[in-house]
């Protein structure tokens, strides 16, 4: 049987892959597994379906004989931070991160504030399979009060991470993406003295991630120019990732953040073996330039759980993904978009340098093209002959290594798409290869879809 867990928890469309029944079973299973009497912490992003899934999860936890505390709408990193600081037994974040509003998901954290590992996932799935469906009754929803003080503890932690540095004199735009960042990003930057303007700052679960946030930088770029700002940062739906933009519209993605932040740590001589961690999506230009200044880039499969494991294994201090998901020792290696934005702003202030100049001192990326092919089927669940049909092309194209060309193809672990990354030293080669690969794979995918 295929696992319900992907690269970042459980993810899918609400009322299709993610149902009340599934959420109840997850809550019940976690409550059954947890052995201490300390409550389970639950948070969510702004999606409309979040309230329904919270109701189901909390009912499951109660039916398993355990207690919970409801944080309400919050950034995902608040959950692991508070688990460690306030000694919760575990935690759940209800969010589909950067996905559209119709999606939702469930991320589970253990007693150490770490995303659960595969053996824990298997235990949850085993218990879920035993839950009597007759127990899952949708009662009339009873309002549950939120613990607002806990969010204040998290935001204080963000401010403390600045180590008495401030952001006075800096004009910064934030795109809160109608999501979790609406709860505290503005107040944190203001408390640190920044002149802040926030766009898309309503808690609107129908607009979350739509034409805004870390996957759509146009609104941020426009606001930076209109307000003559120094820089800006766009968060995703649950604020665990961030992308920056300088005053000229240049993009500071996760690769640039890792290079610049990593170089500071390299100069401070605190990086273990001069190593930072990223994934197979990381740009070759980033890797080559990082190597040129004496650094080592260790690549993992895509997903912050793989980065986290490598950080532990290599005893590294910094890792992340091109998408802006950055893990640092500051907050126990949990991706935190607000914290990352604060650190980048802090370095600009300390170095007395604008983000444009700092970004220009990093590296010139190789041309890349990322194409997503929508799948009408779950890649994990198709029969072996169909899977082999696609894998044959993936293996063939992935073996291309000529002229610093790189191809990486994978089914997404968070949404129904096949991702195709093509990278080379010139854009013409990238476009040619990308078109060739996409055309062949799309033809095979359509053939499979028509036969299902």
Curated annotation (Swiss-Prot):
Q: Does the keyword Protein biosynthesis apply?
A: no
Which spans of this chain does the record mark as coiled coil?
none
Tell me which residues this entry annotates as catalytic.
Answer: 97
**Catalytic class of the enzyme:** isomerase
Pfam family name, one: PGM_PMM_III
Keywords of the record, alphabetical order, are: Isomerase, Magnesium, Metal-binding, Phosphoprotein
Q: How is the cofactor bound?
A: Binds 1 Mg(2+) ion per subunit.
Is Magnesium a UniProt keyword of this protein? yes
**What highest taxon heads this organism's lineage?**
Bacteria
Question: InterPro entries, alphabetically?
Answer: A-D-PHexomutase_a/b/a-I, A-D-PHexomutase_a/b/a-I/II/III, A-D-PHexomutase_a/b/a-II, A-D-PHexomutase_a/b/a-III, A-D-PHexomutase_C, A-D-PHexomutase_C_sf, A-D-PHexomutase_CS, Alpha-D-phosphohexomutase_SF
Q: How is it modified after translation?
A: Activated by phosphorylation.
Q: Which residues carry this modification: Phosphoserine?
A: 97
Catalysed reaction, written as an equation: alpha-D-glucosamine 1-phosphate = D-glucosamine 6-phosphate
Q: What is its EC number?
A: 5.4.2.10
> Which cofactors, if any, are listed as required?
Mg(2+)
GO MF terms listed in the record are: magnesium ion binding; phosphoglucosamine mutase activity; phosphomannomutase activity
**GO cellular component, as recorded:** cytosol
Name the positions where Mg(2+) binds: 97, 236, 238, 240
Biological process GO terms, please?
carbohydrate metabolic process; peptidoglycan biosynthetic process; UDP-N-acetylglucosamine biosynthetic process
| HAMAP family assigned | GlmM_B
What family is this protein classified in? Belongs to the phosphohexose mutase family.
Task of the protein: Catalyzes the conversion of glucosamine-6-phosphate to glucosamine-1-phosphate.
UniProt-recorded name of the protein? Phosphoglucosamine mutase
Q: What is the lineage of its organism?
A: Bacteria, Bacillati, Cyanobacteriota, Cyanophyceae, Synechococcales
């Amino acid at each position: 049987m295929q696992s319900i867990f992907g690269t970042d928890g459980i993810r899918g469309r609400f009322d299709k892959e993610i149902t009340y029944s599934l959420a109840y079973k997850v809550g019940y299973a976690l409550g059954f597994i947890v052995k201490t009497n300390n409550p389970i912490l639950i948070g969510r992003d702004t999606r409309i379906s979040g309230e329904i899934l919270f109701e189901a999860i909390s009912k499951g936890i109660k039916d398993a004989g355990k207690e919970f505390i409801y944080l309400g709408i919050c950034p995902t990193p608040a959950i692991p931070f508070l688990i460690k600081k306030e000694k919760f037994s575990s935690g759940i974040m209800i969010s589909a991160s950067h996905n559209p509003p119709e999606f939702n998901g469930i991320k589970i954290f253990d007693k150490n504030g770490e995303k659960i590992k595969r053996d824990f996932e298997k235990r949850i799935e085993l218990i879920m399979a035993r839950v009597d469906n007759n127990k899952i009754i949708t009662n009339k929803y009873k309002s549950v009060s939120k613990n607002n003080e806990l969010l204040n503890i998290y935001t204080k932690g963000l401010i403390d991470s600045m180590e008495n540095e401030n952001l006075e004199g800096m004009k910064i735009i934030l795109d809160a993406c109608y999501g979790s960042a609406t709860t505290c990003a503005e107040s944190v930057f203001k408390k640190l003295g920044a002149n802040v303007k926030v766009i898309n700052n309503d808690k609107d679960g129908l607009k979350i991630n739509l034409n805004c946030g870390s996957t759509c930088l146009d609104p941020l770029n426009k606001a930076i120019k209109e307000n003559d700002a120094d820089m800006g940062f766009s968060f995703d739906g649950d604020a665990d990732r961030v992308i920056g933009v300088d005053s000229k519209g240049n993009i500071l993605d996760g690769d640039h953040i890792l290079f610049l932040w990593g170089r500071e740590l390299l100069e401070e001589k605190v990086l273990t073996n001069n190593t930072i961690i990223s994934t197979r999506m990381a740009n070759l230009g980033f890797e080559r330039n990082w190597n040129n200044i004496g650094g080592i880039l260790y690549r993992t499969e895509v997903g912050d759980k793989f980065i986290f494991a490598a950080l532990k294994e290599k005893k590294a201090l910094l890792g992340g993904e091109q998408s802006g998901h950055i893990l640092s020792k500051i907050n126990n290696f949990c991706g935190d978009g607000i914290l990352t934005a604060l650190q980048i702003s802090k370095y600009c202030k300390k170095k007395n340098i604008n983000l444009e100049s700092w970004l220009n001192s990093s590296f010139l990326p190789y041309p890349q093209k990322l194409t997503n092919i929508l799948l009408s089927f779950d890649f994990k669940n198709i029969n072996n002959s169909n899977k082999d049909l696609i894998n044959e092309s993936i293996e063939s194209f992935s073996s291309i290594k000529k002229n610093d060309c790189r191809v990486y193809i994978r089914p997404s672990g968070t949404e129904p798409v096949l991702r195709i990354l093509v990278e080379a030293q010139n854009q013409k080669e990238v476009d040619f290869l990308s078109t060739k690969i996409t055309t062949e794979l799309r033809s095979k995918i359509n053939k499979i879809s028509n036969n299902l």
